[in-house]
Structures are given as C-alpha cells and as structure tokens.
Amino acid sequence: MARIFSIQSNLPSFQRQTRIRLGIGSLGRNLDGCRIGFDLGGSDRKAAAVIDGEVKYSEEIVWDPYFEQNPDYHYEGIMDTLKRAAEHLPRVDAIGGSAAGCYSHNRVTWASLFRGVGPKDFDEKVRGMFLKIAEE
C-alpha cells in the first residue's frame, strides 16, 4: 500500500466499516469542445480527437513499452500520440486517458507499462510524467 499511496496505511476489517450505499447515475455526458482521448496499452497507443462529440481523428500506433528501461521512450511516445491528435483540433479543451495501473492525483504510483524502468528513474521521471505532460 505504501508504494501506491506514498504512506503507510492501516485498513480496518470490512465488518467494522459503515454500510456502503451505492447510487446509480450518469457521469460525464459533456461532449462540448475540443477533446483528446487516449489509451496506453502494452502493444499499442490509441488516440482520438473530437469536436463537440464528433470524431475528427482516430489512430492506433504500435509500440512496446513493457520492458523498455528508458522512461524517455514512454514520455516521447505519449507526447507523440497527443500531438498527432492535437493537430486535428483548433485548440485542446480537455484530455482524458486510460492505462493499466494505479494513478493518484495524476501521478503514476504503479503501472505495468513502466515495469522495465528502474526504481530511481521511476521516481524521478515516471511518477510525475503526466503532470509534466499537462504543463506542456
């Protein structure tokens, strides 16, 4: 748990927890604006650019991130995907993505895409990668 949340945690047993009530409702549904969606997989990267919900661009690019030790390979691949999609939009209002792993506050805490990256490079270059991308 410490690796995921960056703190030690102690979880009480489920029996001692307050009853959980699940609500059913719609999330999102906001299609307005110029948006990019991406998915980072183990064998390809996918991206789509939409304007007001209408797809203007969609692409799938082969890549092999799993055992790549250099975090720049991952960063450059992700940026390439986003830039390709952005070329089809007059502006970018929002970006949403998906990738297997654990992410907290847009930081990578653990993800199989980066399994080849050593601990030092992971902490220095991977953990805050999506925050760096958001700034650019």
Where in the sequence are the language-model features?
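Glycine-rich phosphate-binding loop and adjoining helix at the ATP-binding site
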Residues: 1, 62-79, 94, 101-136
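Non-catalytic propeptide/linker segments at domain boundaries
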Residues: 1-33
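Gly/Thr-rich phosphate-binding beta-strand-loop-beta motif of the actin/hexokinase/Hsp70
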Residues: 21-56
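Short, flexible, glycine/charge-rich loop motifs used to bind or transfer phosphoryl groups or to couple energy/partner
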Residues: 26, 85, 132-133
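Short amphipathic alpha-helices and their capping/turn segments at secondary-structure boundaries
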Residues: 34-37, 75-92
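Short beta-strand segments
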Residues: 39, 96-98
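Active-site-proximal loop/short-helix segments
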Residues: 52-54, 99-104
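Residue-level detector of high-confidence beta-strand sites
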Residues: 58-60
